[in-house]
A protein has these predicted regions:
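Aromatic- and charge-enriched surface segment that lines or borders ligand/interaction sites
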Residues: 74-119, 135, 141, 272
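Structural transition elements
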Residues: 267, 297, 301-334, 351-354
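Ligand/substrate-recognition segments at binding pockets and active sites
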Residues: 28, 188, 312, 329-381
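Ligand-site clamp/hinge motif
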Residues: 169, 197-243, 360-361, 369-371
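Alpha-helical secondary-structure segments
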Residues: 27, 102-109, 137-143, 179-180, ...
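Surface-exposed binding/hinge segments that line
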Residues: 88, 122-165
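N-terminal lobe/hinge region of extracytoplasmic solute-binding protein
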Residues: 29-80, 111, 176-178
Length: 381
């Protein structure tokens, strides 16, 4: 059993008012710096925040309502048994280095993603592929081991974007895709810049340039917005300051739901966490609402599954691990565990560092000591 405590984080975004809408460049604030820029060889969400749908594209893409739409594949056919997908590719598409996109690139990408030594973070998306066959430069056939109606959906993920063999070796630091923006520069620790690709096959980008500024410190993020150094800040890291922005006519504050989750994961291979009673005791020792209030200033929702509350399939299971410190103590006693010290590793985001302190205090209240270790994102992954 792998036990988790989960919260959904509220999506917080700040932007300047419509008075600046006429500009054709934008500077975005970004909390976490990507460890690399190859979405097919890294798990960090920060990678896709920069490159997905900007630099790279897949065979399919997600529409605003979640529908699967054509992208580099203009259409596809499915065999009657649901096992063979034939993708009809767009022609006249080029990568940013001038290389022509064709069916060989699709085969290379899918074979690379499902290879035994693949570094793809979502390798399971490609596990059902049996063969990939190039029919002609504009047609590729993917045969699955079993029928899978989700396959076009899987191909819209950031982990399934199409890369070229000519440039793949340098994707981590010099990404080359087919999207509406091309990579310009990465000043590590400071910013990443992309610019409009004039040879784009689809509707040209309205912006000529976009800069992602790395600002991990909440105080610095607040100051950058107030000074006008950034135009917008998705995933804003200082929720305690939102009231100030809300009353300032220069800014627009958007608070929405998200698929993002805050998870406390436990290593259930390591004693005494291999004992389900100990894991349950930890779950009952923690008040998730305290984390939401203390770390995110009320922005968030306790959940008991990996579905967000806005998902139509969501079932509220928070009661299975409700906050109950007395029950937590009883479970520890039943497990015969006392004088327990756990190591709590926390990644860089503010919610994690703040939330970790709250968790440590609540575990201490039931007799569990914690040693907090702050780690960088690359170590965490």
């Amino acid at each position: 059993m792998f036990h988790r405590l989960t919260l959904t984080a509220a999506a917080l975004a700040l932007s300047v008012s419509a008075a600046h809408a006429a500009q054709d460049t934008i500077t975005l604030g970004m909390v976490l710096e990507p460890p690399n820029l190859d979405p097919t060889a890294g798990a960090a969400a920060a990678i896709d925040e920069v490159v997905y749908a900007n630099i790279f594209e897949g065979l399919t893409r997600f529409g605003p309502d979640g529908a699967v739409l054509p992208a580099l594949a203009q259409s596809w056919d499915v065999s009657e048994d649901g096992k063979i997908y034939t993708f009809h590719l767009r022609t006249g598409v080029t990568f940013h280095d001038g290389t022509t996109f064709d069916a060989e690139d699709v085969k290379f990408t899918l074979d690379r993603a499902r290879a035994e030594d693949s570094a793809n973070a979502q390798k399971a998306l490609f596990a059902g592929i049996d063969t990939v066959e190039v029919i002609d430069p504009a047609t590729v056939t993917v045969t699955l081991k079993d029928a899978d109606g989700n396959f076009p959906f899987n191909m819209a993920w950031g982990d399934a974007v199409i890369v070229a063999p000519e440039s793949v070796a340098d994707e981590a630091t010099n990404p080359v895709g087919t999207g509406p923006f091309k990579f310009d520069e990465w000043a590590q620790g400071d910013h990443i810049t992309i610019s409009r690709y004039d040879g784009y096959w689809g509707t040209p980008a309205q912006l000529s340039k976009a800069t992602f500024r790395i600002i991990s410190d909440p105080t610095a993020a607040f100051a950058a917005m107030m000074a006008g150094d950034v135009d917008a800040f998705p995933n804003f890291p200082a929720p305690e300051t939102l009231a100030q922005f809300s009353t300032d006519p220069r800014f627009k504050v958007i608070v929405g739901s998200t698929e993002g989750e805050t998870i406390l994961a436990m290593n259930n291979r390591q004693p005494p966490l291999d004992n389900v009673k100990v894991r349950e005791a930890i779950a009952h020792a923690i008040n998730r609402q305290d984390i939401i209030d203390g770390a995110m200033f009320g922005y968030g929702t306790p959940i008991g599954t990996h579905f967000a509350p806005h998902n139509p399939d969501y079932v509220d299971l928070t009661g299975l691990s409700a906050y109950d410190p007395e029950k937590s103590k009883a479970l520890l006693a039943e497990a015969g565990v006392s004088d327990l010290t756990l190591r709590l590793a926390l990644p860089p985001p503010t919610y994690a560092r703040r939330g970790g302190e709250i968790i440590a205090a609540e575990l201490a209240a039931v007799g569990i000591k914690t040693e907090i270790t702050n780690v960088e994102w690359a170590q965490w992954l």
